[in-house]
């Protein structure tokens, strides 16, 4: 067992190495994504390694499938780990429940050095201590009773088969450390806490032991984690000292809060990544939003790509202020990134395929002309609606149903707008049959204004209202000229002719 503690493990890793260590007690949410993202961009900027380590030592709270889902969501977000339970790597296994022998060996080493001791206090005694402290309006803490057991007393209790845990001896006089975000810090943990449990009775470690042992043996050079662990860092540094190991550099990330300053609640259900993926949000939009609301960059800027986040990230610019998240802005972030996807030919091809599937899914039980599923038509829809939609699925909403199925509009509906339905219809049919190399919105707008002048009494706004209803069945939407360009001359003629013959 002692061989498992050889320090060559820590020395074997070279270069910058960071880790994201989620607990699979739930699924990946925006707070976790932000921690993972800062680790990822820091590693990629420095040509380092991004490690995913599943911290599943609290077995009673592990949610089935959560560990796999977390790794899936990192891939979906575009920030996949270089080493992980799924990908493997030179410092595996990357799941703490599979590393129990290592933690037991580490606790034995501390026991041998006198830096830790076995505690035989029962849960009942610990509960009495807690209640007594609360009754006296004090913070509950362990009274370190078993720290003073003699070797003989320990041997007698072991011989009796009593349950025990391993506690770490907290020492006074901790050394200050320089946090990458919060600057110089130290917390005299021995003055406010009892000796902490590092190995439980079931053989599983607590976070304090597991994270120190794993960060050392996995060669982690920088630990970027949530600010809730800042006050525990002095305790972890005492553990490093007891082992005789060099600690990594620490940087604690400020909290991600709701825009009103309240805590993000996992119970809300609306901060989990799977929900955003199912609703059609682009991962780039989420990455952009959670960095835009915080710090780490020279200036706030919407629309950053992952490559830009990597190149522009400055760890020294992370502030201690909490980041306020305004989820109401997410559709705008998504609109910007969706526009960029549409403009990029390679990314646009993927959107075309996704939109074709959406149309078949939403309108498959209706009479859909096969031509509307053709690549050229779908691509034109995307290019013309670029900048006007926040989600791809917007294009299969009721407002855009006219793009995929022919509306049911009667002559009577149009006559309520203008009595010149036949005249206007014939003028438009004549315009559509006129030869033209390319129909453009600008040219059609000019032609439609010219047509209106040929009517007897129909105003331009009324003519547009009539044509919009005839072509789309809608009273609002894109300009009539855009509708006509999108549908094409043949489809426009078909829809106008259908109304005239009804």
From Swiss-Prot:
<feature type="binding site">
    <location>
        <begin position="263"/>
        <end position="267"/>
    </location>
    <ligand>
        <name>ATP</name>
    </ligand>
</feature>
<feature type="binding site">
    <location>
        <position position="29"/>
    </location>
    <ligand>
        <name>ATP</name>
    </ligand>
</feature>
<dbReference type="GO" id="GO:0008270">
    <property type="term" value="F:zinc ion binding"/>
</dbReference>
<dbReference type="InterPro" id="IPR008925">
    <property type="entry name" value="aa_tRNA-synth_I_cd-bd_sf"/>
</dbReference>
<keyword id="KW-0547">Nucleotide-binding</keyword>
<feature type="short sequence motif" description="'KMSKS' region">
    <location>
        <begin position="263"/>
        <end position="267"/>
    </location>
</feature>
<feature type="short sequence motif" description="'HIGH' region">
    <location>
        <begin position="24"/>
        <end position="32"/>
    </location>
</feature>
<dbReference type="Pfam" id="PF19269">
    <property type="entry name" value="Anticodon_2"/>
</dbReference>
<keyword id="KW-0436">Ligase</keyword>
<comment type="function">
    <text>Non-discriminating glutamyl-tRNA synthetase that catalyzes aminoacylation of both mitochondrial tRNA(Glu) and tRNA(Gln) and participates in RNA aminoacylation for mitochondrial protein translation. Attachs glutamate to tRNA(Glu) or tRNA(Gln) in a two-step reaction: glutamate is first activated by ATP to form Glu-AMP and then transferred to the acceptor end of tRNA(Glu) or tRNA(Gln).</text>
</comment>
<dbReference type="GO" id="GO:0000049">
    <property type="term" value="F:tRNA binding"/>
</dbReference>
<dbReference type="InterPro" id="IPR049940">
    <property type="entry name" value="GluQ/Sye"/>
</dbReference>
<keyword id="KW-0030">Aminoacyl-tRNA synthetase</keyword>
<dbReference type="InterPro" id="IPR045462">
    <property type="entry name" value="aa-tRNA-synth_I_cd-bd"/>
</dbReference>
<keyword id="KW-0694">RNA-binding</keyword>
<keyword id="KW-0809">Transit peptide</keyword>
<dbReference type="GO" id="GO:0006424">
    <property type="term" value="P:glutamyl-tRNA aminoacylation"/>
</dbReference>
<keyword id="KW-0648">Protein biosynthesis</keyword>
<dbReference type="InterPro" id="IPR020751">
    <property type="entry name" value="aa-tRNA-synth_I_codon-bd_sub2"/>
</dbReference>
<dbReference type="InterPro" id="IPR000924">
    <property type="entry name" value="Glu/Gln-tRNA-synth"/>
</dbReference>
<keyword id="KW-0067">ATP-binding</keyword>
<dbReference type="GO" id="GO:0050561">
    <property type="term" value="F:glutamate-tRNA(Gln) ligase activity"/>
</dbReference>
<dbReference type="GO" id="GO:0004818">
    <property type="term" value="F:glutamate-tRNA ligase activity"/>
</dbReference>
<keyword id="KW-0496">Mitochondrion</keyword>
<dbReference type="GO" id="GO:0005739">
    <property type="term" value="C:mitochondrion"/>
</dbReference>
<dbReference type="InterPro" id="IPR001412">
    <property type="entry name" value="aa-tRNA-synth_I_CS"/>
</dbReference>
<dbReference type="Pfam" id="PF00749">
    <property type="entry name" value="tRNA-synt_1c"/>
</dbReference>
<feature type="transit peptide" description="Mitochondrion">
    <location>
        <begin position="1"/>
        <end position="20"/>
    </location>
</feature>
<dbReference type="GO" id="GO:0005524">
    <property type="term" value="F:ATP binding"/>
</dbReference>
<dbReference type="InterPro" id="IPR014729">
    <property type="entry name" value="Rossmann-like_a/b/a_fold"/>
</dbReference>
<comment type="similarity">
    <text>Belongs to the class-I aminoacyl-tRNA synthetase family. Glutamate--tRNA ligase type 1 subfamily.</text>
</comment>
<dbReference type="InterPro" id="IPR004527">
    <property type="entry name" value="Glu-tRNA-ligase_bac/mito"/>
</dbReference>
<feature type="binding site">
    <location>
        <position position="228"/>
    </location>
    <ligand>
        <name>ATP</name>
    </ligand>
</feature>
<feature type="binding site">
    <location>
        <position position="225"/>
    </location>
    <ligand>
        <name>L-glutamate</name>
    </ligand>
</feature>
<dbReference type="InterPro" id="IPR033910">
    <property type="entry name" value="GluRS_core"/>
</dbReference>
<feature type="binding site">
    <location>
        <begin position="207"/>
        <end position="211"/>
    </location>
    <ligand>
        <name>L-glutamate</name>
    </ligand>
</feature>
<dbReference type="InterPro" id="IPR020058">
    <property type="entry name" value="Glu/Gln-tRNA-synth_Ib_cat-dom"/>
</dbReference>
<feature type="binding site">
    <location>
        <position position="55"/>
    </location>
    <ligand>
        <name>L-glutamate</name>
    </ligand>
</feature>
<dbReference type="GO" id="GO:0005759">
    <property type="term" value="C:mitochondrial matrix"/>
</dbReference>
<feature type="binding site">
    <location>
        <begin position="19"/>
        <end position="21"/>
    </location>
    <ligand>
        <name>L-glutamate</name>
    </ligand>
</feature>
<protein>
    <recommendedName>
        <fullName>Nondiscriminating glutamyl-tRNA synthetase EARS2, mitochondrial</fullName>
        <ecNumber>6.1.1.24</ecNumber>
        <ecNumber>6.1.1.17</ecNumber>
    </recommendedName>
</protein>
